[in-house]
């Protein structure tokens, strides 16, 4: 998914780029980039730590969105092709 296409899609719905959906989208792009980097550089421990931090941030945002608006959460999960949160 191209960032500009998602921005134009989001601008139709909301004007703010600080929305939860946009933040999750940008974290997902960073995660995919770091994952492909780590496939080549397995011992890059600093990048591994950064990846874990970004995963935690995205997980917290998704948990917030699932509590506040379940419909938007489901749409975002399907749009980005990521798994749902594990519930305890």
Curated annotation (Swiss-Prot):
TM annotation in the entry: none
Spell out the Pfam families in the cross-references: Ribosomal_S15
Q: What is this protein called?
A: Small ribosomal subunit protein uS15c
Keywords assigned: Chloroplast, Plastid, Ribonucleoprotein, Ribosomal protein
* Assembly with partners or alone: Part of the 30S ribosomal subunit.
Q: Which CDD domains match?
A: Ribosomal_S15p_S13e
**Which family is it part of?**
Belongs to the universal ribosomal protein uS15 family.
Q: Where in the cell is it found?
A: Plastid, Chloroplast
Q: Which GO terms describe its biological process?
A: translation
Which cellular component appears as one GO term in the record? ribonucleoprotein complex
Taxonomic superkingdom = Eukaryota
Q: Which GO terms describe its molecular function?
A: structural constituent of ribosome
